[in-house]
Design a protein with these regions (language model features):
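Catalytic-core regions of core metabolic enzymes
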Residues: 1-453
Length: 453
């Protein structure tokens, strides 16, 4: 698996001079993403492509062979890579097991060739791998637009590892990662998984120092028991978005990756046993990854809803109770501090509504008082339209001093949104989603509020 995520040399089968072909895109992505290892192009015509020497057949072993050829030529390419001693190969073509029995037979042949050579095989019917590499990316995929890499691993999160059975879902993930400023460490599309499965990738990511949170998009689990056992051993949060839950979805999954979706009730029970967080929707999946990628898991369920917006604060409180969070009132000493700083009509319960009339200079101290309260293991911040710099500054400073996890909903205040985002505070698109993302970080909770064992 090291050769897949951290290769030192790469061969691109199907590399083409024709800019319209996917083999050209793949080679260009490898060359321009920031990978500084050895790159070889494999093309029957030989010569040179994009400044890289091209060979008709691989003459030496490389760590990773990226195979972008039609399905009919895939077996020959895999055999060539295996014969040269490659450690791993990724077959990006489609037209295999998802098409029926004949395609499944071709898949089986690919797996047989790889197994005989002790070469790991990803795919077929996948979109490739994206992995942090020094200050850039190993972009062994068809994705042409990736997030800007952090200046160093761990900065800006730099922490989420994604395994997806769907290549197109990877496009959704990278678009959301850019929009949410989500730190990304690794991405692997496993496709039809004739050899490398989501469980294999999960096991590798579990011990990867660059990955702190793991996300998985799956239409079905081919090795359900292996996956559950691997998830149980994993010491990192795992968030799963499971497709193919209903009859129509299961049929679509079968035609897409040639897999069986299984009974979702049994899948949910297995997730619960393994402590896996299951997201109910793609929005929830990305919300939870955003929260877990930016903040440490909350040590408990006691939370403060800190707001200057009455109605949205109540919505957040309703969601918190529904999801199993506790909303204790502040202790008497904390309440006195807040009352001394906020208007007399401020609500000093939970939610704690400082009101827009709070003197700007008082916001930092009042916010710090909330964060200092021992009953609160974390804080959910709500601000609808109050453009007072001291509010954002107070939240950032209090979070930095206490280290308590925070999620936020900020509406129509770009200056404060930017300040909180720069500080690594997850910004969600509604009060309820801010609460749900926080709840996923709380020990023993899932986004739906169901307790995990």
């Amino acid at each position: 698996m090291d050769a897949i995520f951290e290769p030192r040399s790469v061969a691109v089968y199907g590399a083409s001079r024709d800019e319209r072909k996917l083999g050209h895109t793949l080679l260009r992505n490898v060359l321009t993403g920031g990978f500084d290892g050895r790159v070889i192009a494999v093309n029957p015509s030989g010569g040179e492509i994009l400044g890289v020497r091209a060979v008709s057949a691989l003459e030496e072993a490389v760590d990773l062979a990226l195979i972008s050829v039609p399905a009919a030529s895939a077996s020959a390419a895999v055999a060539d890579a295996a014969g040269a001693g490659c450690r791993a190969a990724i077959v990006l073509a489609s037209g295999f097991g998802e098409t029926g029995p004949q395609g499944k037979a071709v898949e089986a042949r690919l797996a047989e060739i790889a197994r005989a050579a002790n070469m790991r095989l990803v795919g077929p019917n996948c979109i490739g791998v994206v992995s942090r590499h020094r200050d850039g990316w190993l972009n062994g995929s068809y994705f042409w637009r990736l997030p800007d890499p952090p200046r160093k691993v761990g900065e800006d999160g730099g922490s989420v590892g994604i395994v997806s059975q769907s290549g197109a879902f990877g496009g959704m993930f990278f678009a959301e990662a850019r929009r949410r400023r989500l730190g990304v460490a690794r991405f692997l599309s496993v496709g039809n998984s004739v050899d490398v499965t989501e469980s294999d990738a999960l096991e590798w990511l579990s011990s990867d120092p660059a990955t702190s949170v793991i996300g998985l998009f799956a239409e079905a689990f081919r090795e359900g028991r292996h996956f559950v056992a691997t998830a149980e051993r994993c010491q990192k949060p795992i968030v799963v978005l499971k497709a193919g839950k209903g009859g129509a979805g299961a049929r679509a999954a079968a035609s897409h990756t040639g897999s069986l979706a299984g009974r979702h009730g049994a899948v949910q029970a297995a997730f619960a046993r393994a402590g896996v967080i299951e997201a109910a929707s793609s929005d929830e999946f990305f919300d939870v990854l955003q929260a877990l990628g930016a903040i440490s898991p909350a040590p408990g369920r006691g939370v403060a809803v800190l707001t200057i917006s009455g109605g949205p604060g109540v919505l957040a409180s309703d969601a918190a109770e529904r999801l199993g969070l506790r909303l204790p009132p502040p202790g008497e000493w904390t309440a006195r501090r807040i009352r001394h700083l906020a208007p007399e009509f401020a609500a000093v319960g939970n939610p704690i509504d400082l009101t827009p009339q709070c003197p700007p200079a008082s916001f930092p101290a009042a916010i710090q008082a909330v964060f200092d309260e021992p009953a609160y293991q974390g804080v959910i911040v709500i601000n609808c339209g109050l453009d007072i710099p001291e509010f954002g500054q107070g939240v950032v400073a209090a979070r930095r001093r206490t280290g308590k996890p925070v999620t936020a909903f900020v509406l129509d205040v770009p200056r404060i949104e930017s300040e909180l985002a720069e500080a690594g505070i997850p910004l969600l698109s509604s009060p309820e989603r801010a609460v749900a993302a926080y709840a996923a970080t709380a020990r023993g909770l899932s986004p739906s509020g169901q307790g995990a064992p």
